[in-house]
């Protein structure tokens, strides 16, 4: 539905600019070439509403309707209750409310399509195979213990059967991916056969989209980085590139810098269209994501603090010089000595109250430099 695509594009623009201070590097206007695969670093769950408007406005997709890209999204977004498990910070009452909400049927209307895994399933999907079965017959002792601890903390009766935990209070655990070795349901063969069949169909659909000339946005890492590392890539990225045969690859990279006053600063680099790699596809895509991640002041300051050193203007200047030599995008706030001094003072002033963010930023900095 054309109108719905426009509404979502405008809504994401409004959200991203209210929640963040967004800085875009690279071309502000461009045309999405047919059969382009847009590869994006996955930093946070908010990545899509940050980059969506940049592509929507930059490629003028309200006008160039035929150029509208499709999105490959992890398949748990299509499961009812996804938003209840979206973040650990939600209260039990909010989880209960969101657990009833399902957006899966509407996602294809805005060109969002699932890409699943044959090797992973959600705890929720495992338990729904046999709702009346004892928890221990379906899940590992560790997961059962975690669910019982959650019940005790929430003042709920101790769960004994699968159906006891298929409710919103447990959503963040229910939407956790598990492998075959972590589950013990008697219907495991049926579950994993169905997962494999769905994953194969979803993969073929995405391949045909690109072959037919559509642009496709993918997050090669699959999920947001838990620790700041860029990579590893999810299984199947190389097969998707080989089978879909995109005409070009367009890298987008996102760097969040929370070591600022007020709203988090987000720097997004829009790269250049380039031919898809013919060899060592996963390695080439990973190197592309790392080398295109913007350098921020928060990364440099965090790396120094985590290593037990005191950040200095010289550290920032050295990082900027190295980024320039390697062609890595740089936050414009670091362009000159005055800007670097201001960012250094600001980051140091805010670092103590956001110390939990420091290891992530430091790891991101080192990972990007690894190339």
List each model region and its residues.
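Non-catalytic C-terminal accessory region of glycerolipid acyltransferases
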Residues: 117-371
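Pre-Walker A (Motif I) flank of P-loop NTPase domains
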Residues: 32-42, 214, 221
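Residues that form or flank phosphate/diphosphate-binding pockets in enzymes
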Residues: 33, 46-49, 228
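A general structural motif
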Residues: 33-35, 66-68, 213-215, 246
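Membrane-interfacial amphipathic helices and adjacent loop/beta segments
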Residues: 1-27, 42, 46-207, 265
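A short beta-turn/loop motif at secondary-structure boundaries
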Residues: 27-31, 258-261
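Short, hydrophobic/aromatic-rich beta-strand segments within well-structured domains
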Residues: 37-39, 70-72, 217, 250-253
């Amino acid at each position: 539905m054309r109108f719905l695509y426009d509404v979502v594009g405008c809504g994401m623009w409004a959200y991203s600019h209210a929640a963040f201070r967004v800085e875009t590097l690279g071309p502000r206007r461009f045309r999405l070439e047919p059969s382009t695969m847009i590869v994006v670093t996955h930093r946070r769950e908010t990545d899509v509403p940050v980059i969506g408007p940049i592509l929507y406005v930059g490629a003028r997709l309200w006008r160039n309707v035929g150029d509208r890209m499709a999105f490959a999204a992890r398949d748990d977004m299509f499961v009812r209750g996804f938003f209840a498990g979206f973040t650990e910070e939600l209260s039990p009452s909010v989880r209960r409310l969101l657990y009833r909400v399902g957006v899966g049927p509407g996602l294809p209307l805005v060109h969002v399509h699932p890409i699943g895994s044959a090797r992973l399933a959600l705890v929720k999907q495992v338990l729904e195979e046999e709702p009346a079965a004892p928890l221990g017959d379906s899940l590992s002792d560790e997961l059962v213990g975690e669910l019982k601890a959650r019940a005790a903390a929430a003042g709920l009766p101790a769960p004994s059967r699968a159906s006891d935990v298929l409710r919103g209070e447990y959503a963040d655990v229910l939407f956790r991916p598990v492998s075959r070795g972590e589950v013990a349901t008697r219907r495991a063969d049926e579950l994993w056969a169905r997962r494999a069949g769905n994953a194969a169909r979803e993969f073929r659909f995405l391949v045909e989209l690109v072959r037919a000339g559509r642009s496709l946005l993918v997050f090669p890492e699959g999920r947001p980085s838990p620790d700041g590392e860029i990579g590893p890539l999810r299984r199947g990225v190389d097969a998707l590139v080989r089978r879909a045969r995109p005409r070009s690859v367009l890298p987008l990279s996102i760097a969040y810098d929370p070591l600022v006053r007020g709203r988090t600063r987000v720097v997004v680099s829009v790269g250049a269209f380039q031919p898809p790699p013919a060899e060592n596809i996963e390695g080439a895509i990973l190197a592309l994501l790392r080398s295109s991640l913007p350098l921020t002041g928060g990364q440099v300051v965090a790396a120094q603090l985590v290593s037990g050193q005191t950040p200095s203007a010289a550290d920032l200047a050295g990082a900027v010089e190295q980024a320039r030599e390697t062609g890595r995008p740089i936050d414009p706030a670091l362009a000159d000595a005055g800007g670097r001094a201001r960012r250094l003072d600001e980051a140091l002033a805010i670092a103590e109250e956001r110390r939990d963010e420091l290891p992530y930023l430091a790891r991101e900095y080192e990972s990007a430099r690894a190339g």
